[in-house]
């Protein structure tokens, strides 16, 4: 038997009527509902402008205390909406933490639209629990 045949025999087919799929869809649906109806928490306010700055400038100084992957994913759909924001004087030194000042200015600049931007960012991050749930099942 060839190596390809052995690999093919080891793969499990995906059954869409499996109860795990129902649980995953329900889980993601509830997360969409929660992401749509709750306000941003303390950290999210700074995460989103930091993620936008990563995409726009390739600069990782804002919120540089955690890995940037989630901020990258969250900021991607917000960049499509092209929020207007002045980025002047956001970084002041290697030991500074300007993300909180930037977050306040970002919310002031985007106004009531900022809640929609946070929703878009949260919806983009739903890929993480969906993938995690899928691979936990596998």
Q: Locations of the language-model features?
A:
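Short, Lys/Arg-rich, polar N-terminal cytosolic tail immediately upstream
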Residues: 1-13
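Membrane-interacting alpha-helical segments
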Residues: 4, 52-55, 74-77, 81
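Membrane-water interface of alpha-helical transmembrane segments
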Residues: 10-20, 115-125
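Transmembrane signal-anchor helices characteristic of membrane glycosylation enzymes that use polyprenol
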Residues: 16-44, 56-59
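Extracytoplasmic catalytic/substrate-binding loops of multi-pass membrane glycan-assembly enzymes
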Residues: 37-49, 60-73
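Extracytoplasmic catalytic-loop and juxtamembrane helix elements of membrane-embedded
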Residues: 42-53, 88-98
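Interfacial juxtamembrane loops and adjacent helix segments
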Residues: 61-124
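Transmembrane-helix motifs of polytopic, lipid-linked glycan transferases
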Residues: 123-138
